């Protein structure tokens, strides 16, 4: 997937702050699609974390696309988030990078989902 590969490349090469980086479009694509196409962003995030464990990529994914997904679509996605966290260690690690930005009930469910208990 070109989008996934470009997102990983732009963050692994420290190009995330450079709008002229040839892969910067991958960051913009998440932002462009976050409101109307959360399912596509969700699928891309899962593919990214199955492809890499790079700290810079995981951190940027949590601080950007995942944070926006939770903020904009948390009510619709919390069940999916919990289910994914049960079986996917990489996803739990991604959740641990997320900072509190959402409504308290959703945030408490995220805290439980990202724990190892």
Regions from the language model: what does each represent?
Residues 1-111:
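Alpha-helical solenoid scaffolds in large eukaryotic transport, assembly, and signaling factors
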Residues 114-117:
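C-terminal partner/receptor-binding element of secreted or periplasmic proteins
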């Amino acid at each position: 997937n070109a989008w996934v590969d470009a997102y990983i490349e732009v963050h692994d090469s420290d190009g995330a702050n450079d709008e002229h980086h040839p892969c910067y479009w991958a960051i913009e694509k998440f932002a462009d699609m976050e409101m109307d196409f959360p399912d596509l962003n969700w699928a891309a995030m899962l593919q990214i974390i199955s492809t890499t464990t790079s700290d810079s990529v995981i951190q940027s994914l949590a601080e950007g696309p995942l944070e926006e997904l939770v903020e904009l679509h948390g009510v619709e996605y919390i069940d999916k988030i919990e289910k994914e966290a049960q079986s996917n260690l990489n996803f739990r690690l991604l959740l641990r990078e997320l900072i509190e930005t959402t409504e308290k009930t959703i945030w408490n469910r995220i805290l439980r989902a990202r724990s190892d208990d």
